[in-house]
Amino acid sequence: EATDSRRGDGVYGKATHAMNLLRERKLLYGISSCYTRANFESITSEEYYDSLIRMGAYFIWYFHYMPVGNDASPELLPTPEQRTEVYRRIRRYRAEKPLFAMDFQNDAEFVGGCIAGGRTYLHINANGDVDPCVFIHYSDSNIREKTLLETMKSPLFMAYHDGQPFNDNMLRPC
């Protein structure tokens, strides 16, 4: 219900069907989950985590909601207390369960801060536009027109490269 309300009717069913097919074929896969102020309890719960293990997932990427764009909802940004709780839960699950979790923002201390702009991460959208980050919907390159190396040398990606690290607080959201 929560997935369909965000992504559209039937999306959750399609996603779980795909996960079942991957599990049946013994293929390695993981999922990405976005937690908000409204859904953080359910999406980081032990019940949710265990359901992913039963469905055969090997890893999960957690992203906390970032209000981006004209239709953004800043009130959905998780509170500092919620982020702290997610931080604790993920570390406990890592120690106890056979599903590896990564927390895009809360694990910044392990990767030296922001990994965007091609430092070790970039985002390619459905149109082929190469964005510095999934949260930054701006691109000066398209994968159909440039190689990844050309993209990494573009003015936008070089500006990211030259500006990193962006701050000393590894847990500060962008």
Enumerate the language-model features and the residues they cover.
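Radical SAM enzyme [4Fe-4S]-AdoMet core and its adjacent flexible, acidic
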Residues: 2-117, 126-127, 131, 135-143
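Flexible mid-to-C-terminal extensions adjoining Fe-S/redox cofactors in radical SAM and related proteins
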Residues: 135-174
